[in-house]
């Protein structure tokens, strides 16, 4: 059983961790920061003169420009 655990840990470290190091653009994305960079605001509801473009951190909040 210990061998299986060791094998799983080695397999995980070889595949997942090296892939994240090789391709950092596929890592996590801060949607709130991306919304602010596009001059938007994270709100629960966009007003009539604003355009909703994406979701922010929570699925209920929208990025309104």
Curated annotation (Swiss-Prot):
Membrane spanning stretches: none
Q: Which family does it belong to?
A: Belongs to the beta-defensin family.
What is the official name of this protein in its record? Beta-defensin 17
Function recorded in the entry: Has antibacterial activity.
What cystine linkages occur within this chain? 35-63, 42-56, 46-64
Q: Sorted alphabetically, which InterPro entries does this protein's record hold?
A: Beta_defensin_dom
Q: A Gene Ontology biological process annotation?
A: cell chemotaxis
This protein's GO cellular component annotations are: extracellular space
Q: Cellular location of this protein?
A: Secreted
- Keyword Secreted among record annotations: yes
Q: Which UniProt keywords apply?
A: Antibiotic, Antimicrobial, Defensin, Disulfide bond, Secreted, Signal
């Amino acid at each position: 059983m210990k061998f299986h655990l060791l094998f799983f840990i080695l397999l995980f470290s070889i595949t997942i961790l090296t892939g994240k190091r090789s391709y950092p653009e596929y890592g996590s994305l801060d949607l709130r920061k991306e919304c602010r960079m596009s001059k938007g605001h994270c709100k629960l509801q966009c007003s009539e003169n604003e355009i909703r473009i994406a979701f922010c951190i929570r699925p209920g909040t929208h990025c309104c420009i």
